[in-house]
């Protein structure tokens, strides 16, 4: 309560006419981190309840925690297994001493040995994820506050979600300066230029990742970025299938086959938050239950993916193994599940009419499979599919609204 009283006591200095008026956006950003603003709608018509933008964004933020924690554990576990597979004895000690992630883990009580426990794996994964997240949060937050100061309006909480989503869809080895550059593009070009929260037509986190993908492909794709172990190279399961079919799915470290359950649980290399479909489903159930995410969009994405993947299965191909990938493998490989649950359902860049949500979701699922199967240079397809569908979302809503108007005119006359 002392903090709240302090913030209330100094608030008048930041209001119009106060000596710190130009810093109101920064004050408001700090204050709303700790307390919900007391502003309510004063003019009709409106319905009041306990849900506001801040609470919605915080719930989405919490919903990605299962995927985030599993992603850190998996990133650490993959790195430790790879290091002990390649090095031993004094050679391993030299490698550990030369990488701050490794020696920091040991300094904090963790272990890089082959028998490292859950805590050590989580700790090592955290040394990769948390710096990326902190960089994204600080740099993106800087741009948010700067634009709010120039426009003289409050800071919205949408960036809490954008920052963590962006940090979860990049490799654990992404250089921090590229993380800063990617979120800068996402916030400034894909969001603030169009007016800020609620006015962007592209998903900012995906737009930032797309920028990095085309500007710095070596650091965000390929075989060397997914496992945080010095000197280790290993393709993702999706890339393995693209080059050799289901028989090519092997653990890059042990050589054992990768089962569907391995991919579903998340015991495979990949972007930090995308590997575990199970963890993503737990978070998705939370936001669907609270009606933050649209079940229609999720169902539409599944329908589009199943329909097109089944069509490719029927057609078949002797030269392209991706034609033969069944729908249940599309679900657990790559960024499909993460994109379906947390990116496609972004209420700002998605369709807002019920019928539009169905077509929007179907387009994403269909486009994702088409890009994965037909495009030989890019085995992943969810990012481009969602950004493509973002462009069509207003069209779907326009068609639905126009048809509703015509139907009502025909029903009730002039």
Curated annotation (Swiss-Prot):
HAMAP family: NqrB. Keywords: Cell inner membrane, Cell membrane, Flavoprotein, FMN, Ion transport, Membrane, NAD, Phosphoprotein, Sodium, Sodium transport, Translocase, Transmembrane, Transmembrane helix, Transport, Ubiquinone. It comes from Vibrio parahaemolyticus serotype O3:K6 (strain RIMD 2210633). Belongs to the NqrB/RnfD family. Composed of six subunits; NqrA, NqrB, NqrC, NqrD, NqrE and NqrF. InterPro entries: NqrB, NqrB/RnfD. It is found in: Cell inner membrane. This is Na(+)-translocating NADH-quinone reductase subunit B. NQR complex catalyzes the reduction of ubiquinone-1 to ubiquinol by two successive reactions, coupled with the transport of Na(+) ions from the cytoplasm to the periplasm. NqrA to NqrE are probably involved in the second step, the conversion of ubisemiquinone to ubiquinol. It is an enzyme of class 7 (translocase). It catalyses: a ubiquinone + n Na(+)(in) + NADH + H(+) = a ubiquinol + n Na(+)(out) + NAD(+). The keyword Transmembrane helix applies. GO terms for molecular function: FMN binding; oxidoreductase activity, acting on NAD(P)H, quinone or similar compound as acceptor. One of its GO terms (cellular component) is plasma membrane. Its cofactor is FMN. It is a multi-pass membrane protein.
């Amino acid at each position: 309560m002392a903090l709240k009283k302090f913030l209330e006591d100094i608030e008048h200095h930041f209001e119009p006419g106060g000596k710190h008026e130009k810093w109101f956006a920064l004050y408001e950003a700090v204050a709303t981190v700790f307390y919900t603003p007391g502003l309510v709608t004063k003019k009709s018509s409106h319905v009041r309840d306990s849900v506001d933008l801040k609470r919605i964004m915080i719930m989405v933020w919490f919903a990605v925690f299962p995927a985030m924690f599993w992603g850190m554990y998996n990133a650490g576990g993959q790195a430790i297994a790879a290091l002990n597979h390649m090095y031993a004895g004094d050679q391993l000690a030299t490698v550990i001493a030369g990488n701050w992630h490794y020696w920091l883990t040991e300094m904090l009580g963790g272990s890089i040995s082959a028998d490292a426990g859950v805590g050590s794996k989580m700790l090592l994964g955290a040394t990769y994820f948390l710096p990326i997240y902190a960089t994204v949060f600080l740099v993106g937050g800087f741009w948010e506050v700067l634009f709010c100061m120039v426009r003289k309006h409050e800071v919205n909480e949408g960036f809490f979600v954008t920052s963590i989503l962006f940090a979860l869809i990049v490799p654990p080895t992404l250089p921090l300066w590229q993380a800063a550059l990617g979120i800068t593009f996402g916030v400034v070009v894909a969001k603030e230029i169009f007016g800020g929260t609620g006015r962007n037509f592209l998903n900012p986190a995906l737009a930032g990742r797309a920028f990095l993908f085309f500007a710095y492909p070596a650091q965000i794709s390929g075989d060397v970025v997914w496992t945080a172990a010095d000197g280790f190279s290993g393709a993702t399961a999706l890339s393995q299938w693209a080059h050799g079919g289901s028989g090519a799915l092997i653990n890059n470290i042990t050589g054992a086959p990768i089962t569907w359950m391995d991919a579903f649980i998340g015991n495979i290399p990949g972007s930090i938050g995308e590997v575990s479909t199970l963890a993503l489903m737990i978070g998705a159930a939370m936001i669907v239950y609270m009606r933050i995410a649209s079940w229609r969009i999720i169902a539409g994405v599944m329908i589009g993916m199943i329909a097109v993947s089944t069509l490719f299965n029927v057609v078949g191909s002797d030269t392209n193994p991706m034609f033969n990938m069944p729908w249940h493998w599309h679900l657990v490989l790559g960024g499909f599940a993460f994109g379906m649950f947390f990116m496609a359902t972004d209420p700002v860049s998605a369709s807002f009419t019920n019928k539009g949500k169905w077509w929007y979701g179907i387009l994403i699922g269909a486009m994702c499979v088409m890009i994965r199967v037909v495009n030989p240079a890019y085995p992943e397809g969810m990012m481009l599919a969602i950004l493509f569908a973002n462009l069509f979302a207003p069209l779907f809503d326009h068609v639905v609204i126009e048809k509703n108007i015509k139907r009502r005119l025909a029903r009730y006359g002039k």
